[in-house]
């Protein structure tokens, strides 16, 4: 079982007198920066000019170019999108890294797949909250926290792990629990979860169910409710208490259908394909394809994205959500050219 660390296992002294540069001020960036500051850590922000720069200044931070922030910092936390990190790192961060500095990530993709090769004279570790930035911030303010993973890739100072734990504590994660992992494990399991279950698997399952009902002559609106809209009700139960709590909370008819029909949908053939997906991740095949896609300016990505946004389930969903202000108020609709939004 994984080793779990809490507040009492972390020592803030490893951040005392240090300057932390948060590179990026998006979902995770703003949460890390504000939580660290509220924990007494000296934080600066590294950005390129734009709206995020203005927002960070409005939030009371000193904002610099990425290169200048990296030069001023003892700890550099890179919170940019994976595909943007290598170029920014090479051009603006790497030249300013000094012996004994710490280079930190919230996802191991670029280190694990050698898109970023750090110098030998810096600590390299990972602090990955298991929740979106707004939740990391909100729970911190409420006196709680979001669990996180930590991993050490390179320990030059002899206390990279201690610094990682101190950082995790300062963003509130050690209030909930910090699990130790490796860059390899975090990267491969995160990608697998996204592809096979949370994103790829789930969206494919929802669409297949929706299409099955529509092709059988049922109204698309009813199919949408049954296969997509009600998903939140089930996911909330799973989130609160796992599979057993969800099954306890639904009707016996639904539970019997779960037991008898679920394995017909997710069968051994599906599991075998999951193993193939995992193999593609482990061997670097997926990473290579994604890197090449970005280098080519994402032609396939953009084409698929456009096609998916025009699927009937999205057309119907936009219409139905317009009838539900309690949903619409919380959502950000994807703007699809030619579609009603």
UniProtKB/Swiss-Prot annotation:
UniProt keywords, alphabetically: Amino-acid biosynthesis, Branched-chain amino acid biosynthesis, Magnesium, Metal-binding, NADP, Oxidoreductase
Annotated binding of Mg(2+) 1, by residue: 190, 194
Domain KARI C-terminal knotted: 182-327
Binding positions for Mg(2+) 2 per the UniProt entry: 190, 226, 230
A cellular-component GO term for this protein: cytosol
Known pathway: Amino-acid biosynthesis; L-isoleucine biosynthesis; L-isoleucine from 2-oxobutanoate: step 2/4; Amino-acid biosynthesis; L-valine biosynthesis; L-valine from pyruvate: step 2/4
Keyword Acyltransferase tagged: no
Annotated KARI N-terminal Rossmann domain residues: 2-181
Assigned EC number: 1.1.1.86
Keyword Cell division belongs to the record: no
NCBIfam families linked to this entry: ilvC, PRK05479.1, PRK13403.1
Pfam families xref list: KARI_C (PF01450), KARI_N (PF07991)
Residues annotated for NADP(+) binding in this entry: 25-28, 48, 52, 82-85, 133
Reactions catalysed: (2R)-2,3-dihydroxy-3-methylbutanoate + NADP(+) = (2S)-2-acetolactate + NADPH + H(+); (2R,3R)-2,3-dihydroxy-3-methylpentanoate + NADP(+) = (S)-2-ethyl-2-hydroxy-3-oxobutanoate + NADPH + H(+)
Binding annotation for substrate: 251
Function: Involved in the biosynthesis of branched-chain amino acids (BCAA). Catalyzes an alkyl-migration followed by a ketol-acid reduction of (S)-2-acetolactate (S2AL) to yield (R)-2,3-dihydroxy-isovalerate. In the isomerase reaction, S2AL is rearranged via a Mg-dependent methyl migration to produce 3-hydroxy-3-methyl-2-ketobutyrate (HMKB). In the reductase reaction, this 2-ketoacid undergoes a metal-dependent reduction by NADPH to yield (R)-2,3-dihydroxy-isovalerate.
Name of the protein: Ketol-acid reductoisomerase (NADP(+))
Active site: 107
Molecular functions (GO terms): ketol-acid reductoisomerase activity; magnesium ion binding; NADP binding
Cofactor(s) needed for function: Mg(2+)
Family under the similarity heading: Belongs to the ketol-acid reductoisomerase family.
InterPro entries: 6-PGluconate_DH-like_C_sf, KARI, KARI_C, KARI_N, KARI_prok, NAD(P)-bd_dom_sf
Gene this protein is translated from: ilvC
GO BP annotations, alphabetical order: isoleucine biosynthetic process; L-valine biosynthetic process
UniProt cofactor note: Binds 2 magnesium ions per subunit.
